[in-house]
Amino acid sequence: MAEDRDWQRLDKWLWCAHFMKTRSDCARLVEEGLVRINRQPTDKPHARLRPGDVLTLPLRGEVRVLRVLAMARRRGPAPEAQALYQEVEEAPGADGLRLA
């Protein structure tokens, strides 16, 4: 089912972008307060994510900062998932973020 909205649930976007194997794992990461949207902590998997937002999240022992480029239509292959975001070089405001 294609979504024509200008936003997408945070947990679904993380899952479609291949950051976790299951959507439940994505929701758990968010619920633990480990994710920030535009430097603001969130613990709500249903938070609205839009193109241009900046995500800060801990993955595999490091803090990653990503700019959202597009909303996901489905959980597709890796090249399709990688086109959803762009790595941001600096990690501003990531100082207080706990690593999972």
Regions found by a protein language model. Name each.
Residues M1-K12, C16, S24, R28, ...:
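Strongly charged
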Residues G33:
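Glycine-centered, phosphate/nucleic-acid-interacting loop/turn motifs that mediate DNA/RNA or nucleotide
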